[in-house]
Amino acid sequence: MASSLEIFDLATGRARVVLRTEARIEAPNWDPSGATLLVNGGGRLYRVPLAEPALVPVDTGFATRCNNDHGISPDGRWIVLSCHRERGSEMFLMPAGGGEPVVISPEAPSWWHGWSPDGTRLAYVAARGGRRVIDVYTLAVAGGA
């Protein structure tokens, strides 16, 4: 399976191919500077610098079964990601430069959805109490991000 990463210009209505790869990549998210995209593929996270597009691996420590729920904090210092472990999908917080993630979801399964604009809260969806119903939750990020 091949992937093509494109940026769509709303003003012109044109798409620009940033990267073509034989790897399956998905879920691009902007870094706050607009200079880099964060994508996932094969359970790993990658940065794609727009100035010199390439898949640059992000060190996620033990988190090697990441799904497409990931994003960079508004201040660019943190990455939140969802990764499958024994309990199911859990949410983790780690430095944007890479490193060992720390679990932040109170229960599993939990899937990250978004940062609050001020970087102090996370929105996520989760199934609780053995139910098959998915609800929306928020979680404070200690000290903000």
Feature map (PLM): residue ranges:
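Short loop/edge segments at beta-strand edges and connector loops
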Residues: 19
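Conserved beta-propeller blade repeats
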Residues: 22-38, 64-79, 107-125
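Beta-propeller blade-edge and WD-like acidic-aromatic loop motif
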Residues: 1-16, 33-36, 40-60, 78, ...
